[in-house]
């Protein structure tokens, strides 16, 4: 009798879930497609946007002047950028650094041409462009020190266009010649 009750309860719960799904999707196929789908693994882009804004808006001068730095929201941006960066593997940080540098590069290109880069027919899903040395150098010099994280040495010598995109919780492996990376 107890097992029958549990079985009936499970059947009712399953039927309710299916009915709710049907009700939600019965208004049209397009609305079903617009419902957010759960992502099995986190995507890096939101944190990297925060990191690019952090690097561009929170200069070393503002960082040294702590009251101005805190009032400008830099402390919150630093936390939103640095916490996820500290939680990923060093290998994945190399891709994160490339993502930040590319976001900054696209923003600067958009400013140069008077409009955001994405409005010019390019999207973030296209193949990576070569990041200028000045931008990559600024990111590599500033981000690790402001976030107190280590960036692998090969990030300083490997072009971003050759680094495979990483999902942060899957470690990337580097090929090292002679045991040195």
UniProtKB/Swiss-Prot annotation:
Organism for this UniProt entry: Triticum aestivum
SMART domains xrefs: AAI
Gene Ontology MF: a single term: nutrient reservoir activity
Protein name: Avenin-like a6
One family name in Pfam for this protein: Gliadin
Keyword Disulfide bond attached: yes
Role, per record: Seed storage protein. Not integrated in the gluten polymer through disulfide bonds, unless incorporated by reduction and reoxidation during dough making. Increases dough strength and bread volume, but decreases dough stability when added into a base wheat flour.
PTM notes: Contains 7 disulfide bonds.
Record key words, sorted: Disulfide bond, Seed storage protein, Signal, Storage protein
Family: Belongs to the prolamin family.
Signal peptide positions on this chain: 1-19
Membrane-spanning segments: none
